[in-house]
A protein has these predicted regions:
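Long, contiguous binding/interaction regions
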Residues: 1-84
C-alpha cells in the first residue's frame, strides 16, 4: 500500500443507532485523519447515516474503515482520491 496522502469520504449506515457510541469511539481514535463529519439520524426508525471527510494514507484510512465495518449493524463504504 502507498503512503501517499489521499482525500476521501467514508459513508456509514447504522441499522441501529445503538452503535453510535462505538462508532464515535473509533472515529475519535482516528481524529488525526478525520477532517469533517456529519450525522443524520432517522427519527422514524432507529437508523442513521454518518459521513466522514478524511485525509490520510491508505493504511490508516483502511484501518478506520475496517474497524467501523466490523461493528454489528453497520455498513461502510469509502472512496478516496487517486492522489492528492
Amino acid at each position: 500500500m502507498s503512503n501517499e496522502i489521499r482525500l476521501g469520504f467514508i459513508g456509514i449506515v447504522m441499522d441501529d443507532r445503538g452503535a453510535a457510541d462505538e462508532i464515535n469511539h473509533i472515529v475519535g481514535e482516528y481524529s488525526a485523519v478525520v477532517k469533517a463529519r456529519i450525522g443524520v439520524p432517522d427519527n422514524r426508525t432507529a437508523s442513521g447515516v454518518i459521513g466522514l471527510i478524511v485525509e490520510g494514507d491508505n493504511l490508516t484510512i483502511g484501518s478506520l474503515t475496517a474497524k467501523l465495518g466490523n461493528l454489528k449493524g453497520v455498513q461502510v463504504k469509502s472512496a478516496l482520491s487517486k492522489q492528492k
